[in-house]
């Protein structure tokens, strides 16, 4: 069996988004399943819109997702000589020709076709003239006037397009640059690509590219056109649906394992299984079971998956992943050990690393930086609150065994001996030590913050009341 070779070919005119990442993942999995080769090609022929910064973020996003590529990255901008070589072959073999028609002439042809109720197109007036090269001319493919193009798509099944529906497409522009249709065929052939997975917005390109393959006598790869990803309202996916660049998900504290698991289910299934290890994905993904209906992006499902993966990680690993986020918040003095001590209180409450840092922030900051919202104070403070805080402070200061069990007992005894209910002191004590009204177990929170810091926080709120 011929070795399976796939590729991902983004254009560096923007960042890598969800749709592109899914295409890359499907192509990567197919290659890895068959122990094949996965290539990365940067289609940077649009010199005006292509930017190095976009190339950098695409590569960073791919690396973060773990979609490693084989061999050197191919840059289209460095392959012009090869494209011109192939164009010369097509001209010499009679499969392409020079066209000297002006833009105005071509627009007139199209308008005449529209008036006749026909598809607007170039009418092939230069097709048989055997014109020579012209600085203002273009090179066109001589599309067979009869027949059809048929290919079996991994997603859509058999697709057939009549040649009469196709134009004599431009292969080389008047400025001498090759068009996308020509460049992509040459690249895929030279890279020995056997399977091309891409968005179904490319379906109309495929018959044109197959005609170029046929003209050159090259083997045609297998195509799979996956449907676009829609928003939850079944409209075109956009930022308002929660979809952003892959790099932004990384910055928001999502895990690559969760992203991969989520992306693969947007257009592929394996029975009813929802959660996969990477090895399972490689084992199961063979190019079948690709969905023909568009998938809907659901940020809540992604958050749920991320929380699942986050909570399965060892505390030490989560702490390592959190360090950059903690540093970004300005906590340069916080150690990994400190993060590990606080983590167990909050990991079940957070969906992402960024949210985890946000929840832990009241514990990580010092008493001097802790603030209390006036609305929270008004909501829970009574005439007796300050007195309760004074007494509890003294009890906590005197407590030798600063452990959750003893702190819980201390609070319980205070409530019982003063004929109180927990709601009369619990919220004010929590607000004093953490700055917020909600959170984990109060006694565990107090212990994790530490006696010295807890006393300082109690003093701070007491003086504010």
From Swiss-Prot:
Pfam families: Anticodon_2, tRNA-synt_1c. It catalyses: tRNA(Glu) + L-glutamate + ATP = L-glutamyl-tRNA(Glu) + AMP + diphosphate. A motif ('KMSKS' region) lies at residues 236-240. The keyword Nucleotide-binding applies. Its EC number is 6.1.1.17. GO terms for cellular component: cytosol. InterPro entries: aa-tRNA-synth_I_cd-bd (IPR045462), aa-tRNA-synth_I_codon-bd_sub2 (IPR020751), aa-tRNA-synth_I_CS (IPR001412), aa_tRNA-synth_I_cd-bd_sf (IPR008925), Glu-tRNA-ligase_bac/mito (IPR004527), Glu/Gln-tRNA-synth (IPR000924), Glu/Gln-tRNA-synth_Ib_cat-dom (IPR020058), GluQ/Sye (IPR049940). GO terms for biological process: glutamyl-tRNA aminoacylation. GO terms for molecular function: ATP binding; glutamate-tRNA ligase activity; tRNA binding; zinc ion binding. The keyword rRNA-binding does not apply. Binds 1 zinc ion per subunit. Catalyzes the attachment of glutamate to tRNA(Glu) in a two-step reaction: glutamate is first activated by ATP to form Glu-AMP and then transferred to the acceptor end of tRNA(Glu). Monomer. Belongs to the class-I aminoacyl-tRNA synthetase family. Glutamate--tRNA ligase type 1 subfamily. This is Glutamate--tRNA ligase. It comes from Lawsonia intracellularis (strain PHE/MN1-00). The gene is gltX.
